Amino acid sequence: GIKGAQATAAAMFLARTGSSKADIRTYVEREFGYDLSRSCDEIRPDYHHVESCQETVPQAITAFLESSDFEDALRTAVSLGGDSDTLAAITGSIAEAFYGVPEDLKAECRRRLTPELEALLLAWEARAA
């Protein structure tokens, strides 16, 4: 739990402050002891639904490290299988910090919100700004 949250937060911070993917990988491996040496192609064949940070966070970070943009990061995370919504949430948080979210994707997501949820999102964005 806590170790996974700390590793994710550290990766997000490093991504947001301009660190390279290589630097993010090195930091996470060194500080949290996660093995990020397996590629997504190596993870995919035997990955299954796991609720443990030790078997979710490293895979999510690897999906980010192998990605070329925000959408690719999410698609790569989901393609691993297993607990794909959790993987995509972790990967997406790091990818957003590194790449940003394309405006067309933001617009499409907003279009799908109910008016109540859109108002809540706008209020949160105003408060976070």
Question: Language-model features: where?
Answer:
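Solvent-exposed loop and edge beta-strand segments that line ligand/cofactor-binding
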Residues: G1, P45-V50, D83
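Short, structured coil/loop segments at alpha-helix boundaries
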Residues: G1-I2, E29-S37, Q54, P102, ...
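Catalytic phosphate/nucleotide-handling subdomain of diverse soluble enzymes
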Residues: G4-F13, A60-A129
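Small-residue-rich helix-loop
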Residues: A5, A9-M12, S20-Y47
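Double-stranded RNA-binding/processing signature
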Residues: T17
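Conserved phosphate-donor
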Residues: S52-T62
